[in-house]
């Protein structure tokens, strides 16, 4: 059994060459782990659109300017963005070639989404999060090749696929259905220190125990219902392998502090810092770099 896995397909950042490569890979089906679309508009300050001092590659020069121009919020906006993505010839070809199994991440809604909100949602200008979340989910079910698990609740998307006795594929929703607000300590929107300085105070507050207890010890990525569903399915399964399809890295991801600091100074400084770290003793402070991962 062979399948192709995709995630984080940002239209304005480049072409979907990997979809073309998968056409003749021998894959029998495709799995997309989320961020099939991105909600950002065409504002040059938004991720994926702006020129960088190192490459000067822009969405304009690539002919990949998104529509509508605003961050997508309404049902019409989300439908329009899916329609634009589907104009990509490689994506069209892969959908025609093989079946897909998909799950959403945050950008099908808004950056760093959770149950009650998102980093890239402003209720004062974009209305209620619940309303935006509902129309985003509706557009997803309209445009994606998915057998909707529960037509009465479009936000319930986790499900299981059994491939004979070989393996079970458990597709989770670690974003919308049960996630609490994550620790915010990152470079801007998303990891780009040229856009917004690192929020060290917020970051440190989320990592500093008070009387031996971490402030966010009660945070979770799955609801109790979904967790029980997953563990129950795994316990009852008779397949050889259990595979979890989810949106986030299931490992610790640490960066040297000097490398993180150099990132804000451009490619040359970043490369120098990486080289120095790799050639020197491994003694400096490291920090976790992706605070919405399953990194323990």
Task: Show the residue positions of the predicted features.
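Metal-dependent phosphoester/phosphodiester hydrolase catalytic core
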Residues: 1-296
């Amino acid at each position: 059994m062979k399948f192709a896995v995709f995630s984080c397909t940002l239209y304005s950042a480049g072409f979907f060459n990997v979809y073309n490569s998968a056409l003749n890979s021998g894959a029998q089906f495709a799995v997309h782990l989320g961020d099939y679309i991105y909600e950002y508009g065409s504002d040059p300050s938004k991720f994926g659109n702006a020129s960088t001092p190192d490459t000067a590659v822009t969405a304009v020069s690539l002919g990949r300017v998104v529509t509508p121009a605003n961050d997508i919020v309404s049902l019409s906006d989300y439908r329009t963005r899916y329609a634009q993505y589907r104009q990509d010839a490689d994506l069209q070809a892969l959908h025609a070639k093989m079946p897909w199994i998909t799950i959403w991440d945050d950008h099908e809604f808004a950056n760093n989404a959770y149950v009650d909100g998102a980093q890239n949602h402003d209720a004062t200008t974009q209305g209620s999060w619940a309303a935006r979340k509902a129309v985003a989910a509706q557009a997803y079910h309209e445009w994606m090749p998915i057998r909707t698990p529960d037509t009465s609740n479009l936000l319930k998307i986790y499900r299981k696929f059994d491939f004979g006795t070989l393996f079970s594929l458990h597709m989770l929703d670690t974003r919308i259905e049960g996630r609490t607000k994550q620790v915010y300590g990152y470079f801007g929107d998303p990891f780009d220190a040229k856009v917004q300085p690192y929020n060290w105070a917020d970051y440190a507050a989320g990592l500093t125990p008070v009387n031996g207890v971490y402030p966010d010890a009660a945070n979770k990525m799955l609801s109790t219902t979904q967790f029980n569903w997953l563990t129950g399915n795994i316990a009852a399964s008779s397949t050889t392998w259990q595979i979890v399809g989810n949106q986030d890295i299931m490992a610790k991801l640490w960066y040297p502090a000097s490398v993180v600091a150099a990132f804000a100074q451009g490619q040359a400084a970043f490369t120098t810092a990486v080289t120095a770290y790799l050639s020197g003793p491994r003694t400096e402070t490291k920090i976790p770099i992706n605070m919405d991962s399953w990194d323990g």
